[in-house]
Amino acid sequence: MGNVFANLFKGLFGKKEMRILMVGLDAAGKTTILYKLKLGEIVTTIPTIGFNVETVEYKNISFTVWDVGGQDKIRPLWRHYFQNTQGLIFVVDSNDRERIGEAREELMRMLAEDELRDAVLLIFANKQDLPNAMNAAEITDKLGLHSLRNRNWYIQATCATSGDGLYEGLDWLSNQLKNANR
């Protein structure tokens, strides 16, 4: 009987967990974002070959964030991380106008995958501190986000180095998780 109450208490007041897959083209800022959220500081990064995984605690939610390398040669490996993903963070370098079309192709390819059909989508429009950065509305248009049907999505302007916008993105993810559990 005590176990029933313990489980009920945990369900009401315990930590919720959310599995997040963070992807995007190479040099978009994924690893910088991960460690800014985890450590609160900027770390020196090198191109990710493989993945980094960290748990980020925020507002009584334990986010397990998988940061997977974005170089074109290793993008086919992304699909190995799709299973059980509840939230997808797609990081875009807002200053990289030349590759926004490539980013759109990769995003749409992923969203067509059956294993990600229930995952919510958060776009981090990163590097907003740079003078020629595209704003969130322009990125929304160039990624074709308004054409998405049956998918909860949100775009957040961010700057990984200062941390601007990162926690607002986690707020949106945590609200999606709470709404899904109702």
Swiss-Prot record:
Ligand binding (GTP): 24-32, 126-129, 160
Keyword entries, A-Z: Cytoplasm, ER-Golgi transport, Golgi apparatus, GTP-binding, Hydrolase, Lipoprotein, Membrane, Myristate, Nucleotide-binding, Protein transport, Transport
Primary localisation category: Golgi
EC numbers, comma separated: 3.6.5.2
SMART domains assigned to the protein according to its UniProt record, in alphabetical order: ARF, RAB, SAR
Gene designation per UniProt: Arf1
Reactions the enzyme catalyzes: GTP + H2O = GDP + phosphate + H(+)
Lipid attachment locations (N-myristoyl glycine): 2
UniProt name for this protein: ADP-ribosylation factor 1
UniProt note: phenotype after gene disruption: Conditional RNAi-mediated knockdown in the eye results in aberrant compound eye morphogenesis. Maternal RNAi-mediated knockdown results in abnormal aggregation of Golgi apparatus and disrupted cleavage furrow ingression in early embryos.
GO MF annotation: an example: GTP binding
Enzyme class: hydrolase
Activity regulation (UniProt): Alternates between an inactive GDP-bound form and an active GTP-bound form. Activated by a guanine nucleotide-exchange factor (GEF) and inactivated by GTPase-activating protein (GAP).
Gene3D superfamilies: P-loop containing nucleotide triphosphate hydrolases
Protein's job: Small GTPase involved in protein trafficking between different compartments. Modulates vesicle budding and uncoating within the Golgi complex. In its GTP-bound form, triggers the recruitment of coatomer proteins to the Golgi membrane. The hydrolysis of ARF1-bound GTP, which is mediated by ARFGAPs proteins, is required for dissociation of coat proteins from Golgi membranes and vesicles. Has a role in eye development. Required for cleavage furrow ingression in embryonic cells.
Lineage of source species: Eukaryota, Metazoa, Ecdysozoa, Arthropoda, Hexapoda
